[in-house]
Swiss-Prot record:
Belongs to the glycosyl hydrolase 13 family. GlgB subfamily. InterPro entries: A-amylase/branching_C, Branching_enzy, GlgB, GlgB_N, GlgB_N_E_set_prok, Glyco_hydro_13_cat_dom, Glyco_hydro_13_N, Glyco_hydro_b. It comes from Burkholderia pseudomallei (strain 668). Keywords: Carbohydrate metabolism, Glycogen biosynthesis, Glycogen metabolism, Glycosyltransferase, Transferase. It is an enzyme of class 2 (transferase). It catalyses: Transfers a segment of a (1->4)-alpha-D-glucan chain to a primary hydroxy group in a similar glucan chain. Catalyzes the formation of the alpha-1,6-glucosidic linkages in glycogen by scission of a 1,4-alpha-linked oligosaccharide from growing alpha-1,4-glucan chains and the subsequent attachment of the oligosaccharide to the alpha-1,6 position. The active site is at D417 (nucleophile), E472 (proton donor). One of its GO terms (cellular component) is cytosol. Pathway: Glycan biosynthesis; glycogen biosynthesis. One of its GO terms (biological process) is glycogen biosynthetic process. This is 1,4-alpha-glucan branching enzyme GlgB. Monomer.
Length: 738
């Protein structure tokens, strides 16, 4: 080979890991009539160019002892032809034959990059991250990362000794995306990105924002995921997905079991580690299905560095947490759930992210994913960065992650966390600590547009059909579940935080004082049909000193459990879908602790087994009785029979479906049995007592009406017929026409 020039300035910039355009000097280049190959291989002893068949084309001369080599390929190639060669590299302890990463042309389609810059989440999903694939018949990994403010980016990992000089990336300048194909590596490789800010300063090594797999914390590297294996995963849930696509979930029975998967099951014999997805599939899935729940909802499982955040401070929104095993394990978990008749909902956090140095904050030396102004970009309550969802690329990145959960893992629902914090610019901020919108108001117009885009995308052709969206929205923002075409946000369901706060406040009162707080239980019906609601008894209500559900109740242990049973009977009969956090289904005494399992040992006690049995029966009756769910979002599905008996703390109402089927719920929230309580009923004849939360099987006194009551033509409560009931203490009855 002939000598080949290698500019000194280029050498110095490459060795200093600050060259802005490595493809301008590395790889094959025409110099006069010759094709010159230049490489940067720190630590290499000798480099030769070899042909595809293995023959040596020639030696690359070492032009700098730090690892720069250059040489010219033999003549005879047409000017427009890409040279075909490999590099044979002698390292101190091995020889490596590999294609030159800088011999490949541009990787990403310009149209896809333009669509990403315009905010298309499908383009973000297609372009960004690490993808094992073949380029020109050569296996390797394509890396791509959005970092428009960086002056230089390289990919580092085990494959190059974490040397930031080895694999600098190409900038696709109009779009701010850096790309590189690294030959002969594949799925399972650990990697990060080494970036320099615009001023040349080196930044902390950054994990890939679009990584689909990560190391288990506290380690922080990204891992090249085997996306082909996920795409080839042997799903057997076609029938489930077809049924989901045609199901009108708003008028179906929905009862959600909320689970913190890191603590639901731990393996004590192995250092109290969290269970894997496969272990959870064997234990959690049959348990939740056996309890009659329709869905399990998982607190955020996208990789998060701090376990104490319960997943709500994620840095890798595309990657199932490695705490539970590889990504394919989560796919198997969902497959098991669908086979058992359970839907899977995942919590998703597009509002904010933590400040860990390997994460998204100041990713390229600028406020890239967050707002630059701390009045917009820093959350004072959580000490986290606020996503700048008004930036098109950030919105595309986030919504792409939601699409990934729907496509790759077949999840059935996505619950959006902290929506209120996104909707209001002054959320948890004092005067002077927030920036008004362009009209001078407090509404966050960018977040509104983002949430509409999210829902339109998840309900459109880009997503699998039938994926439901849920909003944790704690204010009275109008139209959360209204269609975006009608100026709503477009969610399928909204958590009814007002109902939860009011009813729990009522139940905390000593029964003797409840007459003074009667309206707390009736007020929810004033707005119950303004949105499609979920009634949430979530993790947020059993942490930070709030106490467990059972501990919130007044009285001795028996009365506390009786109160809770009566409350559950009221809740399951009330309009709205149901959600219950783990441990609540058997009335555990301790509040939620992320590093401890639920108090499963309480199930050795008959009283707690009784509450568990009640929740199971409530779920099964709720699913079997269309009157309890078919018109959850319509006034025609509900009517008060007794809403004003504050002196006795008695409530009664009727639920109906559109075929005229009925079920009456009667609640006595005092410890005083009510005998001969005359209740107006909407039909004559025999009414079966289909549920009594005071039943002996549930841990109650077994007071009641012997399984049935008779409605005679005696007017009461505005009805033509009525029956004399015995109302057990602290209990709810359900009656159905026999």
């Amino acid at each position: 080979m002939t000598d080949a020039p290698f500019d000194r300035a280029d050498i110095d910039a490459l060795l200093g890991a600050r060259h802005p355009d490595p493809f301008a000097c590395l790889g094959p280049h025409r110099v006069g009539d010759a094709t010159v190959v230049r490489t940067l291989l720190p630590g290499a002893l000798r480099v030769r160019a070899i042909a595809a068949g293995g023959g040596v084309l020639g030696e690359l001369r070492q032009v700098d002892p730090a690892g720069c080599f250059a040489g010219a390929l033999p003549d005879g190639r047409e000017r427009g032809e890409r040279p075909r060669y490999r590099l044979s590299i002698d390292w101190p302890d091995a020889r490596q034959d590999v294609e030159d990463a800088y011999a490949f042309g541009t990787l990403l389609d310009e149209d896809a990059l333009a669509r990403f810059a315009a905010g298309d989440p499908r383009a973000a999903l297609a372009c960004l991250g690490a993808r094992a694939l073949d380029m020109d018949g050569v296996p390797g990994v394509r890396f791509a990362v959005w970092a428009p403010g960086a002056s230089r980016v390289s990919v580092v990992g085990d494959f190059n000794g974490w040397d930031a000089r080895r694999h600098p990336m190409r900038l696709r300048r109009p779009w701010g995306v850096w790309e590189l194909f690294v030959p002969r590596i594949g799925a399972g490789e650990r990697y990060k990105f080494a970036l320099r800010a615009r001023d040349g300063a080196a930044l902390p090594l950054k994990a890939d924002p679009c990584a689909c797999r990560t190391e288990a914390p506290p380690r922080t590297a990204s891992i090249v995921a085997d996306l082909d294996a996920l795409e080839r995963f042997g799903w057997h849930d076609d029938a489930w997905l077809r049924a989901r696509a045609s199901l009108d979930l708003a008028h179906a029975p929905v009862s959600i079991y909320e689970v913190h998967p890191e603590s639901w099951l731990r393996v004590a014999a192995e250092g109290n580690r969290s269970a894997t997805w496969d272990e959870l599939a064997q234990r959690l899935i049959p348990y939740a299905a056996g309890m009659g729940f329709s869905h399990v909802e998982l607190t955020p499982i996208a990789e998060y560095p701090f376990g104490g955040s319960w997943g709500y401070q994620s840095l890798s929104p595309f990657a199932p947490s490695a705490r539970f095993g590889p990504p394919e394990g989560f796919a198997r978990f969902v497959e098991h759930a669908h086979a058992a008749g359970l839907g899977v909902i995942v919590d998703w956090v597009p509002a904010h992210f933590p400040d860990d140095p390997h994460g998204l904050g100041k990713f390229d030396g600028t406020a890239l994913f967050e707002h630059a102004d701390p009045r917009e970009g820093w959350h004072p309550d959580w000490h986290t960065h606020v996503f700048n969802v008004g930036r098109r690329e950030v919105g595309a990145f986030l919504i792409a992650s939601a699409l990934a959960w729907a496509h790759r893992y077949h999840v059935d629902g996505i619950r959006v966390d902290a929506v209120a914090s996104m909707l209001y610019r002054d959320y948890s901020r004092a005067a002077g600590e927030w920036v008004p919108n362009v009209y001078g108001g407090r509404e966050n117009l960018e977040s509104i547009a983002f949430l509409k885009h999210f829902n339109d995308t998840l309900h459109g052709p880009a997503a699998p059909p039938g994926v439901a969206t849920f909003a944790e929205e704690s204010t009275a923002w109008p139209g959360v579940t209204a269609p975006t075409a009608e100026h709503g946000l477009g969610f399928d369901f909204k958590w009814n935080m007002g109902w939860m706060h009011d009813t729990l406040a009522y139940l905390r009162e000593d029964p003797i004082h409840r007459r003074h707080h009667h309206d707390r239980l009736t007020f929810g019906l004033v707005y119950a049909f303004s949105e499609r609601f979920v009634l949430p008894l979530s993790h947020d209500e059993v942490v930070h000193g709030k106490g467990s559900l059972a501990a919130k109740m007044p009285g001795d242990a028996w009365q506390r459990l009786a109160n809770l049973r009566a409350y559950f009977g009221f809740m399951w009969a009330h309009p709205g879908k149901k959600l219950l956090f783990m441990g609540g289904e058997f009335a555990q005494w301790e509040e939620f602790a992320h590093d401890a399992t639920p108090q499963w040992d309480l199930l050795d006690a008959p009283a707690h087994r009784g509450v568990q049995r009640l929740v199971r029966d409530l779920n099964r009756l709720h699913a079997a009785e269309p009157a309890l769910h078919a018109l959850d979002d319509r006034p025609a599905g509900f009517a008060w029979l007794v809403g004003d008996d504050r002196n006795n703390s008695v409530f009664a109402f009727v639920r109906r479906d559109d075929a005229g089927r009925m079920l009456v719920a009667v609640c006595n929230f005092t410890p005083v049995p009510r005998t001969d309580y005359r209740l107006g009923l909407p039909a004559p004849g025999r009414w079966a007592e289909v549920l009594n939360t005071d039943g002996a099987a549930y841990g109650g006194t077994d007071a009641g009406n012997g399984g049935a009551v008779q409605a005679d033509e005696i007017p009461a409560h505005g009805e033509r017929w009525s029956a004399a009931l015995r109302l057990p203490p602290l209990a709810t009855l359900w009656l159905r026409p026999a």
